[in-house]
């Protein structure tokens, strides 16, 4: 079903022609403003004596749908919600202007920073350092990216495929080589059973328990 925000946006668009366009412009303006402020911070770093001894990491916690797949929001496991900017500058490790097309998630951030800083790691950490990719963006990477939205709903993104498994047992599979906009869910096609199986093995085996709603406790 369509989300309330998208439904509300469509209603506003019908009543006030051009309101959707204004929403897109406002979103772009916010992104441009944030970009300018980040530039100010980086300019200050370039002028400082710590320029060559500072690791810079820029990332976002989520992407955003701007009407794609009938959504104007972030609450989904599709590409537009899960794909985020992730930029790392590590003096002596990364090279300016390089790009890596491997799929990673934010569990890599902690172990990566530990390795870059030469600090001891936590053996229980779920993530894996991507320093090898920072040194060589073309290096092979077997581990896909995992995204979770609420309990039991997960997406596994490899370089070609996005597999989504929902808490109700339903699933989706998209081939980004032939369907980059994720219009055609091919999870029901038996030809891709092996692809689904290879991605399912990356789903979490255990999940944390439900968080109690403290607002309902007496005295809260």
Language model features by range: what are they?
Residues 1-103, 116-124, 165, 182, ...:
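Active-site-proximal cap/lid insertion segments
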Residues 62-68, 94-95, 105-110, 115-176, ...:
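C-terminal cap/loop subdomain of S1 sulfatases and analogous C-terminal strand-loop tails that border
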């Amino acid at each position: 079903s369509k989300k309330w925000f998208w439904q509300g946006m469509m209603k506003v668009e019908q009543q006030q022609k051009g309101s959707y366009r204004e929403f897109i412009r406002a979103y772009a303006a916010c992104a441009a403003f944030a970009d300018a402020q980040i530039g100010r911070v980086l300019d200050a770093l370039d002028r400082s004596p710590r320029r060559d001894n500072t690791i810079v990491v820029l990332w976002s916690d989520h992407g955003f749908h701007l009407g794609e797949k009938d959504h104007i929001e972030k609450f989904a496991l599709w590409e537009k919600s899960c794909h985020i900017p992730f930029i790392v500058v590590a003096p002596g490790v990364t090279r300016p202007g390089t790009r890596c097309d491997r799929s990673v998630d934010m569990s890599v951030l902690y172990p990566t920073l530990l390795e870059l800083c030469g600090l001891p790691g936590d053996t229980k950490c779920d993530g894996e350092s991507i320093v090898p990719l920072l040194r060589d963006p073309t290096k092979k990477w077997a581990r896909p990216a995992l995204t979770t939205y609420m309990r039991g709903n997960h997406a596994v993104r490899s370089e070609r495929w996005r597999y989504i498994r929902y808490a109700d047992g339903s699933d989706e599979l998209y081939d980004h080589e032939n369907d980059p906009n994720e219009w055609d869910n091919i999870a029901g096609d038996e030809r891709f059973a092996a692809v689904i199986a290879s991605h399912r093995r990356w789903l979490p085996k255990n999940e944390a328990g439900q968080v109690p709603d403290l607002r309902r406790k007496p005295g809260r």
